[in-house]
């Protein structure tokens, strides 16, 4: 029994030493993040982005921030108004529905993560 106890203690100490040495190594890396909140598309905004053929182009609206979005490692935007599809009429407050083309234009601007979980998710 004593031999089993000593063997267990030695094994525990060896593994503790090995684990401690692995933790001592510095593997830290830095991540730069930019976050934008409340990309809320009211009717005046999507009407401004609408072309005569019914398509939408939101890219000019994001052109002033494109360079600021490009430099961080991760760019996050909170898409406040839902993209409910083109079969449902586009609308603003209180029951938002935003043209789906805004998603592609947000990605083209340089955003990596688009959040859709917010208080307008079920509009």
Task: Identify the role of each PLM range.
Residues 1-9:
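Bacterial N-terminal signal peptides that target proteins for export
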Residues 20-123:
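Acidic, metal/ion-coordinating pockets
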Residues 8-18:
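Bacterial N-terminal signal peptides
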């Amino acid at each position: 029994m004593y031999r089993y106890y000593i063997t267990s203690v030695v094994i525990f100490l060896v593994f503790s030493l090995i684990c401690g040495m692995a933790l001592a190594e510095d593997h830290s890396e830095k991540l730069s993040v930019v976050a934008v909140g409340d990309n809320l598309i009211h009717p005046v905004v999507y009407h401004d982005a609408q072309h005569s053929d019914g398509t939408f182009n939101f890219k000019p609206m994001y052109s002033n921030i494109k360079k600021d979005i490009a430099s961080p490692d991760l760019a996050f935007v909170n898409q406040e108004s839902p993209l409910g599809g083109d079969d449902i009429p586009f609308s603003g407050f209180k029951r938002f529905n935003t043209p789906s083309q805004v998603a592609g234009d947000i990605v083209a601007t340089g955003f990596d993560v688009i959040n859709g979980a917010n208080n307008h998710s079920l509009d």
